[in-house]
Amino acid sequence: MDTVTSKELPTLGLGLHFEDLPVGRAFRTIGRTITEPDIVNFINCTGMTEVLFTNLEFLKHESDIKGRLAPGSLVYCFAEGLLVHATMQKTGYAFLGMTLAIENPVFAGDTIHVEVAVTESRRSKSRPNRGIVTTLNRVVKQDGTTALTYTPTRMIKARGTGEG
């Protein structure tokens, strides 16, 4: 260690480049358990204070949903958080759009992970040092059920311009 400077050490945890994301590449993230404090903090931070998320008596007696329900937007945000740590540090330039479908509820105590498959990948015509990548992302609960799916398109840093 004495002969290696800090700047010479490789940095772990950096994102994937455009060239690392060809069509067909697939991977999954680590898991993350959704807790009751996560839900309470999220609904208070976002102002999503509808009774479905804030009133346990309503859930017990007036709703067919039983248990502390997580808003779909919380599940999406946590999925993106799992992906940022795994794939986009210093390489993600822009979020360009997506479609999203909520398929099953997530409750406090559920653990989610994200399964990702690259469906489109091309070098940007106007910015050849970047790529445009679309993925199919499935947020999966511990029992194997899909909570939500979404298809983000992102601008990702490339290692080079693709010339030469």
Q: What are the roles of these predicted feature ranges?
A:
Residues M1-P22, I102-T111, E115-G164:
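HotDog/MaoC-like acyl-thioester-processing domains
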Residues D2-G97, R159-G164:
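Hot-dog-fold acyl-thioester-processing enzymes
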